[in-house]
Amino acid sequence: MFDISKDFVSIFYRKETLKNCMFGIIGSRSETTLRQQNDKDWSFFVNDANRITGFNFFNIKKSFKKFFLSHRFNEGLNYPSLKIMKRISELLGYDLISLANKVPFVVCEVVSVIPIANTHLKRCKVNTGLTKSLDIVCGANNVRVGMKTVLVQVGGVLPSGTVIKKTKIAGFDSVGMLCSEKELNLKQKNEGIIEINPKIKVGKPFIDVYLNKQHSKWVNTKKRVKLS
C-alpha cells in the first residue's frame, strides 16, 4: 500500500478544453477501476468493491442547472464542498457525501533526503502523519530534512489538469509530488517547492490551491509569519 488510506476527491472543470465537461477522481481508489457505467449526461467508474473511483459529467450546465444559480464552477480545480458532493451523489445515485472537504493536498514533513548519483534528483521520504513515510523523488534545490511542504497524493489533480500517478523516476518509486507555488497556481515564478510554516501540523489539508490565495499564514515567506 502506498496511499494515505483516507479517500479524497479531485474535481476539475474547464469550459473550453474539456467542452463544458467536469471530471472527478477519487484518489485512493483511482487505480482499481474494473467497470464503467454510462448515461447520456454522465459516466462513472466502479471497482471490485462496487465503489466509485471516478466520474464525468458531459454537460454540467444541464446536470447542475439549479446549482449554477448560486454557484459557479471555477476554471480548473474545484473544492469538493458539501454542496457539490451532495449534488454529485444525487445525480449518480451513490453516496459520496463523505468525500466533502477531502482534498489530495496535504502538509508533510521531509524526513530524509538522499541525492541520486549523476542527477539533480533526490530520493525523499516524507511524513504525512496519516500513514508510514512515503517515497518521493524530487528535483527541487531547496528540499531538505525538516522542512514542511505540500504533498499531492497519488490520484490528485494539479491546477494544470495533470493527474499525479505512482511512477518510477531514475529507477526509484515516487508515490506523489512535492509542489512549488507555481505548480499550485499561487505564484508565476518557480522557486523550488513551497515551504510551509513549521508550526503547521503534518496531515493538514492545504486549501490555498483552491482559493488562489498567495502567501497565507501557512506559507513561509522571507519574513516569518506568525500564526494568529
Swiss-Prot record:
The protein's matches in InterPro entries, at most eight in alphabetical order, are given as: NA-bd_OB-fold, tRNA-bd_dom, tRNA_bind_bactPheRS, YtpR-like_sf
Q: What is this protein called?
A: Uncharacterized protein MG449
Its source organism is Mycoplasma genitalium (strain ATCC 33530 / DSM 19775 / NCTC 10195 / G37)
Any one Gene Ontology molecular-function term assigned to this protein's record:
tRNA binding
Keyword list (alphabetical) reads:
RNA-binding, tRNA-binding
Q: Which Gene3D superfamilies match?
A: Nucleic acid-binding proteins (2.40.50.140), YtpR-like (3.30.1940.10)
NCBIfam families listed in its UniProt record: YtpR
- Phosphoprotein as a keyword of this entry, yes or no, is no
| Ranges where the tRNA-binding domain occurs | 99-207
**SUPFAM superfamilies with a match to the protein in the record:** Nucleic acid-binding proteins
User: What's the domain of life for this entry?
Assistant: Bacteria
- What Pfam families does UniProt report for this protein, alphabetically? tRNA_bind
